Each structure stands twice: as structure tokens, then as C-alpha cells.
């Protein structure tokens, strides 16, 4: 389903994981629900539907170094995002990298300058959009980040 409750696609599978590509939800997010069934005497007996799970895409980013300790992160806007949370780590190659929320910016913003990079370390960044669906706010799940060696 789209975030506006329009049915987009139905999948039948015997697998526990399904990967799919629906261009209509690219950069927008979607809702998903599942139910199982068993065959008894060649007749399908269905279980109850799960609750809807709202899936918001993580913002696709690029980073560019602008001076010795500064990088600019740019991202593609996510439809209906109300704000973006920017997270950074100044030593991604450490045994236990420490991520910090460095900024929260509005929906009209598509870039941010991070100026706390440490020379000799690898700075990593990711951006999480927050989208309003109905009366609720949803954030994208953290899936990936980009990093740059600061030399």
C-alpha cells in the first residue's frame, strides 16, 4: 500500500524473505502487512492479517570535503518528510564507533555542513528522514552510511 492507502501490489511467496521493486514508492515509503495460510485438503485456510508496518526510505546521500575539517552532506529529499536527522561518527574504523546526532533540519533543506571532522580519522555520516503518515510520525531505519578518510 502507498502511504495514502492505495493498494500497489500483492505477493504470494513460500519464502520468509521477499525483495521487490515498486517504482511508485521510490523515495516515498509504503505500508506493508502480511498473513499466512496453510493448505488443508487442497484448500487454503488463511490466518489473520498483521498490523500495517510503515517503511520509510533512508535518504540517499553524498558527501564532499570542503576544507580540512569540514564535509558537506547532500541528500535526495524524501516525499512528505517533515525533518531530517543527521548523524555523524568521527572514527568509523574504531572497535566501537560512536554515533552522535549532530543536527535536525527542516524539510526544505537538502544539505548540511559538518565541521567537526578529525584529521587522521574516518568521518561517517547518515541522514534519517521523519515522515508524517496520518497523525503519526515515522523515521526511516538506519541501514547504511558513507564515510570519508580525513587526511
Residue ranges and their predicted role:
Residues 1-26, 85-119, 132-134:
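Recognizes extended acidic, P/S/T-rich segments that occur
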Residues 9-11, 30, 48-53, 100-103, ...:
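Short beta-strand segments
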Residues 11, 32, 36, 49, ...:
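Fold-core signature of tandem repeat domains
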Residues 12, 68, 72-74, 111, ...:
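Serine/threonine-rich, low-complexity intrinsically disordered segments
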Residues 13, 39, 65-66, 107, ...:
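Generic beta-strand structural signal
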Residues 20-44, 114-139:
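Beta-strand-rich modules
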Residues 43-80, 136-151:
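Pro/Thr/Ser/Gly-rich low-complexity, intrinsically disordered linker/stalk tracts
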